[in-house]
Amino acid sequence: MQTHHWPAQQRVHAGVGALAALPKELDAFGWQRPLLITTNSLIRSGMAERVRALLGDRCAGMVADIPAHSPLESVARLVAKFGETRADGVVALGGGSVIDATKGMLVALGAGLQASDITGKALTGASGGGTSAWGTDFSRPRMIAVPTTLSAAEFTSFGGVTDTAAGRKLMVGHPLAVPVVVIQDPSCTLDTPAELLLSTGARSVDHSVEGFCAPNASPISDATAIEAARRMWSALPRMHADPTDLAARSDAQAAAWLSIQGRSGGVSHGASHGIGYLLGGGFNVPHGLTSCVMLPAVLRCDGR
């Protein structure tokens, strides 16, 4: 028997101009005090201000000091800020590190943890449900994600946070930690450094290939993995050749979405992902780069 799980997401807005849907989504959920979580680089580029302007007077505050690999210390700061600002929802603007740190915060808040409670053991203990159930506590705070990379973290209910003291990555999650709404606007990726954007596109190829090769792959995961790889293989060279090509960026975002359908549905990953978690948590190597290096080597090993 094969079982495919669907994430507890309501809507995905995709394409040029999709960011304009954000105020209507705030209205739909009745959020009066959303907290904006982003990065310092997106503040410097002006992208964070563009999103903050859409939030208007409702914006409860902004947190921007989210380092790569979502350290536990960042999760603790987010938990504290959410309480201090009396926020009622979250808008996460950024890549996988921002979105995963926000997932960690949502897991902690759902379990009633305070900032001082945030340890690796406490956060993994608060995680539950995986992809097997949506749960029943729909009073939990939720996230709207505006991705600026191609990591596809916005389509899963789980994420990686780093215990810097131990030098390892921890997987945390809850069915309702997945963003309830995703806004894929290619213009939101224009300020992302080329190396980061292109390497996270390679990470999506890694999702596709390892998902297709997984022993518990399904017809759904196979179909989406093949189409994701085809689209990304076409989009990445076009993005590299013309950084202003929004059609190529939109195709890459669609490919990222497709690439993670197997993983978010319960399909296992392979050694490239596993080694990537070790390198990321222990040595702060970006996951996009670990995929570029490890996937070819893992495939050669698997093919023997």
Model-based region annotation:
Residues A48-V51, L78-V79, V98-A111, T156-S157:
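Short Gly/Thr/Asp-enriched flexible loops that form oxyanion-binding sites at enzyme active sites
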Residues H69, S97, M105-L109, A122-L123, ...:
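Acidic, glycine-rich active-site loops and adjacent beta-strand->loop/helix elements
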Residues A87-M105, T148-A153, V285:
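Glycine/serine-rich anion-binding loops at beta->alpha junctions
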Residues V79, P175-V182, G266-H273:
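Acidic-glycine-rich active-site phosphate/pyrophosphate-binding loop
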